Amino acid sequence: MQGSVTEFLKPRLVDIEQISSTHAKVILEPLERGFGHTLGNALRRILLSSMPGCAVTEVEIDGVLHEYSSKEGVQEDILEVLLNLKGLAVKVQNKDDVFLTLNKSGIGPVVAADITHDGDVEIVNPEHVICHLTDESASINMRIRVQRGRGYVPASARVHAQDEERPIGRLLVDACYSPVDRIAYNVEAARVEQRTDLDKLVIELETNGTIDPEEAIRRAATILAEQLDAFVDLRDVRQPEVKEEKPEFDPILLRPVDDLELTVRSANCLKAETIHYIGDLVQRTEVELLKTPNLGKKSLTEIKDVLASRGLSLGMRLENWPPASIAED
């Protein structure tokens, strides 16, 4: 085995041992020393906590007001019935939220196959027992809500303020969305030519049947790769700050000269010179204003004082005046 001392080995052999339709063992080798635990632990955590799936989240049972009760003619108490419903393995196509119904009467077990659903729903474990009816006249009617999600979400985490209006008798169920029932990994020694310090990763997992074990590992590896992509190219991906554009002119310059509340004489003199905005006025000099008919030193002093009270003065230079909004007017 030739290669640079800095070159990492890549797994060349992937062996998949299909024990059953829901149980498989995947062997990956060779791996550099330590990479067996690095990859095995990462994949295990993703498979257990981050795989999407469907689970029962709410149940309504006729005649039942809360989970701490029992129902006449049903062998199990309501808590046990809810626990059994959590064991349903459901596949839903094209929807994230569906409602199923179950209506059964007469002595005998109530199983998942008794649930009524449409073509978008598939119950993978139809023989799964939900409860037992113990009397010929006994019956059970329930409405089951199934939602798509990820990981494990307890009922308490889904209680919101608006849920105070939830009808009495609608029971929340802890939702285990992950389709993976069990996952374990083991790291064994591997050898390639003269190297004996390599790892062999053995992953064994069982699913609830809604996903193939091989596909589950493939999805987990994809999730891990997508998360690590950010480290491959460490660029600053933060959104650039949007700088607020400052107005080209002080808003006071865009106001009409009438807002200065000058005397009638001074105001009329300015209008006669087509000075309509404060921005027009501040660009005039004292000499120019004194040339205005009927505008004397008293009016000039008044104008200067009013402008000074607003932080302005005569003889100011304004680039690009007038602005488009005024020019259009």
Swiss-Prot record:
Family annotation (SMART domains): RPOLD
Keyword Signal recorded: no
Top-rank taxon: Bacteria
Region described as Alpha C-terminal domain (alpha-CTD): spans on this chain: 249-329
E.C. no: 2.7.7.6
Record's keyword terms, sorted: DNA-directed RNA polymerase, Nucleotidyltransferase, Transcription, Transferase
Pfam families the UniProt entry points to: RNA_pol_A_bac, RNA_pol_A_CTD, RNA_pol_L
Enzyme's top EC category: transferase
Cellular component aspect of the GO annotation: cytoplasm; DNA-directed RNA polymerase complex
Family annotation (InterPro entries): DNA-dir_RNA_pol_insert, DNA-dir_RNA_pol_RpoA/D/Rpb3, DNA-dir_RpoA, RBP11-like, RNAP_asu_C, RNApol_insert_sf
Region (Alpha N-terminal domain (alpha-NTD)): 1-235
Function: DNA-dependent RNA polymerase catalyzes the transcription of DNA into RNA using the four ribonucleoside triphosphates as substrates.
Database matches in HAMAP family: RNApol_bact_RpoA
Entry protein name: DNA-directed RNA polymerase subunit alpha
Organism of this sequence: Pasteurella multocida (strain Pm70)
